[in-house]
């Protein structure tokens, strides 16, 4: 059995039927797929089409109980997902290092900053310092937003100053870049990367 750091058991997501084509105007809150699944499909599209190489980092696991029924075989009986020390995804696009986190919230009024940890913020700052492109993809309020790391840093530091522990809906809509949902790729975040970082030498269509 594999458990999360809070002790809850891990239950893999089961398929619930045939996938349907989703139009670009669909509300994200009405879709069956998770943000992670959509991003994984998007990254596969980028890879197959030679656009970018982006992968999800494996979640570290701590094994606490192993059974050895045979000398040549081992069965993991109990393990826990460890807290990730960095971000969810990384890779390369047009010679630039890409590093980002993906988060979801069901709140209808704000995005809680408790979804992040200090060590993740520090990691993103280090990436930007070295010239990497760092951002957050947030699923909130029925839409998906691309939030540059620099804006996240502002909200994080503000939390320390005045105690506001969330990004309001209006703030996210203003600071973030709304991404229209598509079919292939599903969440075309590279288009935003291109606009923000390669606008003078655009190649991506």
Swiss-Prot record:
InterPro entries: Resolv_RecU, Restrct_endonuc-II-like, tRNA_endonuc-like_dom_sf
Signal peptide per UniProt: none
EC number assigned by the record: 3.1.21.10
GO molecular function: endonuclease activity; magnesium ion binding; nucleic acid binding
GO cellular component terms attached to this protein's record: cytoplasm
Cofactor: Mg(2+)
Localization of this protein: Cytoplasm
Residues annotated as binding Mg(2+): 86, 88, 101, 120
Recorded family membership: Belongs to the RecU family.
Protein's name according to its UniProt entry: Holliday junction resolvase RecU
Provenance organism: Bacillus pumilus (strain SAFR-032)
Organism classification: Bacteria, Bacillati, Bacillota, Bacilli, Bacillales
């Amino acid at each position: 059995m594999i458990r999360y750091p809070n002790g809850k058991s891990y239950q893999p997501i089961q398929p619930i039927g045939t996938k349907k084509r989703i139009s670009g105007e669909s509300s994200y809150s009405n879709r069956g797929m998770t943000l992670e699944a959509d991003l994984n499909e998007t990254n596969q599209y980028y890879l197959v089409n030679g656009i970018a190489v982006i992968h999800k980092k494996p979640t570290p696991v701590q094994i606490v109980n192993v059974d050895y029924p045979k000398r040549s075989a081992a069965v993991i009986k109990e393990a826990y997902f460890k807290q990730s020390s960095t971000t969810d995804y990384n890779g390369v696009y047009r010679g630039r290092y890409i590093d980002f986190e993906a988060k979801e919230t069901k709140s209808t009024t704000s995005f809680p900053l408790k979804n992040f940890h200090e060590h993740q913020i520090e990691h993103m700052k280090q990436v930007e310092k070295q010239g990497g492109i760092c951002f957050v993809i947030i699923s909130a309020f029925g839409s998906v937003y691309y939030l540059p790391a620099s804006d996240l840093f502002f909200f994080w530091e503000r939390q320390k100053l005045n105690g506001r522990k969330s990004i309001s809906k209006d703030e996210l809509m203003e600071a973030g870049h709304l991404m229209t949902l598509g079919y292939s790729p599903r969440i075309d975040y590279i288009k935003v990367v291109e606009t923000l970082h390669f606008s003078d030498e655009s190649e991506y269509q």
